[in-house]
Amino acid sequence: LVGVLEGEILIQNHCYRGEEMAIMLDIAKEFNYKVTTFHHAIEAYKVADILADNGVCAAMWADWWGFKHEAFDMVWENAAIVDQANSGTGCAIIHSDSAIGIQRLNQEAAKAMAAGNRAGFNILPSRAIKWITSNPAKALGIADKVGSLEAGKMADLVIWDGNPFSVYSKTEKVFVDGLLLYDKDNPSTPKATDFELGIINSQENRL
């Protein structure tokens, strides 16, 4: 609790409903701590301005809701509304707690971007890419290390052969901490340790 009150521990709050998010922010103000992100924020669009005013991110699915009572009232434009709140100062994150969805998180972001654009929000790809890069890094408190391409950061990078939001684009290269771990044109590229696949590299080659 001391770490929370002193700001050393970032609060990641699981919360579906808009009024519950507002209540949690009131409690945070009362006890002088900060909520960093609301996760599974189905109704974030209802309190998007409040979230933006308080510098709070909302981690949302692109198009999944209705699976239980408190997850009923979402809209397709949820991420776009959060992103564009208060003149575009909102912090939207597209996430997935599914082992399947996480493999195509770029396409999940593309779906949310398309929904926002259909509603007239004019979400640019350069904005939507932040939903799965710099905004999550901000929420985790590691934006000084990852999330964008800047000198001094860890150089985690994917190079695509086309639009990263397209279902037709394929990965050409993957760098982690500046190290080339995948090269489509070079099958001999050393693979990272993956215990599920039984790939175990020597200690000096591990990340």
Predicted regions and their residues:
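His/Asp/Glu-enriched, well-ordered alpha-helical/loop segment
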Residues: 10, 49-52, 56-160, 169, ...
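Active-site environment of divalent metal-dependent phosphoester hydrolases
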Residues: 18-22, 41-48, 101-103
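Polyanionic/metal-chelating signatures
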Residues: 1-39, 170, 176, 202-206
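Extracellular/periplasmic ectodomains of large secreted or surface enzymes and adhesion receptors
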Residues: 176-207
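Short active-site-adjacent structural elements
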Residues: 167-168, 184
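Distinct, well-ordered alpha-helical segments
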Residues: 21-28, 47-52, 109
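A general structural motif
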Residues: 13-17, 39-43, 69-76
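Small/polar (Gly/Ser/Thr/Ala-rich) solvent-exposed segments
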Residues: 164
